[in-house]
Regions:
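Secondary-structure edge/capping motif, primarily at the C-terminal ends of alpha-helices
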Residues: 86-87, 113-120, 166-173
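Helix-turn-helix
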Residues: 23, 31-66, 70
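Conserved small/polar residues in nucleotide/adenosyl-binding loops
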Residues: 188-193
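Amphipathic alpha-helical linker/stalk segments
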Residues: 71-98
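N-terminal intrinsically disordered/low-complexity leader segments
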Residues: 1-19
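Amphipathic alpha-helical packing segments from all-alpha helical-bundle domains
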Residues: 80, 84, 121-168
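A short, Lys/Arg-enriched amphipathic alpha-helix from helix-turn-helix/homeodomain DNA-binding modules
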Residues: 18-30, 76-77, 82
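Helical hydrophobic small-molecule/effector-binding pocket
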Residues: 92-118, 125-130
Length: 193
């Protein structure tokens, strides 16, 4: 089989595009970590990077919702990178590890998580509503345990209720209190699929 020559200019352009896109997602993460969501727009991104407004608009199809969705997924991948190396063959332990990692990240990044949570409210019922890698991984672990759809929904509900508690009460700083609430319920569900 004969290979067609690769146009190196296209490869360089693709790498440059990906590099700029990653930079914009990092800037978005920093903005969501330090500013209120209502103070952020595609225009404000240009204040924190050397990327032109035109390029920013091109990367996100002139849509602030697309920007928020991609930043949320980007943050989800960061959280996923934290726990991935510690996953085992035990889906029960993995589920609790993912929850714990998520909560610890929430506790240490309150402003970011508040803005992400507010973004979810903005994006609900739109094409931009993001499904994070964290939720995909939790769902996979629960499927490996042969959970019913009803039990999977209950675990995810508990997950979101706990996120509400964290975001609603920034004085709650002890992850162990949250995990004490979720572990018994999780184990009950995990042992009774």
């Amino acid at each position: 089989i004969e290979r067609l020559p690769v146009d190196k200019r296209k490869l360089v352009a693709k790498n440059k595009y990906d590099s700029v896109h990653d930079e914009l997602l990092e800037v978005g993460t920093r903005l969501l970590s330090s500013e209120r969501l209502t103070e952020i727009s595609l225009n404000t991104i240009s204040d924190y990077t050397n990327v032109s407004k035109t390029t920013i608009y091109e990367h996100f199809s002139s849509s602030f919702n697309a920007f928020l969705s991609e930043v949320i997924i980007h943050v989800g991948k960061k959280i996923q990178n934290i726990y991935t190396e510690n996953l085992s063959q035990d889906p029960s332990s993995n589920t609790l590890l993912i929850f714990r990692t998520w909560y610890e990240f929430n506790f240490t990044n309150i402003m970011l998580m508040r803005n992400i949570y507010a973004s979810y409210i903005l994006l609900v019922d739109t094409e931009y509503f993001p499904i994070t890698p964290v939720l995909i991984d939790i769902e996979k672990q629960l499927k490996d345990l042969e959970f019913s759809m009803k039990n999977m929904k209950e675990i995810v509900r508990i997950f979101y209720v706990s996120v509400d508690d964290i975001l609603g009460n920034p004085d709650v700083k002890k992850i162990d209190h949250v995990m004490k609430d979720i572990e018994p319920v999780s184990y009950t569900h995990l042992t009774l699929p």
